[in-house]
Amino acid sequence: MTELVARRRGLLALSRREAHRVLKLWTQTVAAPILSSFLFILVFGLSLGGRIKHIDGIDYDVFIVPGLITMAMIQATYANNSASVFQARFDRYLNDVLAAPMRPWEINLALSIGGVVRALLIGAGLLACALAVVDVPIQHPLALTAAVALALVLFSSFGVIVGIYASSWDHTAFVTNIVILPLSFLGGVFYSVDTLPSPWHEISHANPIFYLLNAVRYGFLGTSDVSVGLSLAVSGVLAAAMVAWSSWLFRTGHRLKP
């Protein structure tokens, strides 16, 4: 065990640094996203819950919770990793990491840890806040665990990739505001995609976040707009593709080496 820890000393040190970066600014990185998402539950769930009684037989204020948790977690893990990697490139700190006796997969994994830690803290905190006002069950814990794991792998790797390719802070923010946020809302956070008319119903099935969101909702509530097997399969393929892409970048040094 001691020998294993010694061989992975660089991985552990860089992972601790990324996690500490999140915890040091917890009011901004964790508390603020929890508060903003909890306001969605209060404003949309409790205010509209009196008018929109049920969706798929589930109270509206309960129905929106899994989607809001998913949206908060994927935004957090992407934002954290894209910002961390871009800043490391901008400050030339990443050059020191690349020169360290670490394997490419170790660097890739360590730089992803911060986003995963941040997302898990936000997800747990938001669920705790939601349970204070609504009764949210967990019907399928294994499916929920798999869905959350795939979501974090997918968007933590995606954040690393964008951080490597970005040429300015605007580029990282662009992906959040123009890609992730709209796709999250259009993925069915506040509604069931089955209620949409054609062709919007079919178009929604081309949205990757739609599958993640429905897999998480199935884990919580036992309901989904699409087969949970298909949701996990699509999410797994996308996560594997993002991991392969980010691993290739670190293995080849593309856009990393000065």
Regions found by a protein language model. Give the residues of each.
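Hydrophobic transmembrane alpha-helices and immediately adjacent juxtamembrane helices
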Residues: 1-142, 146-258
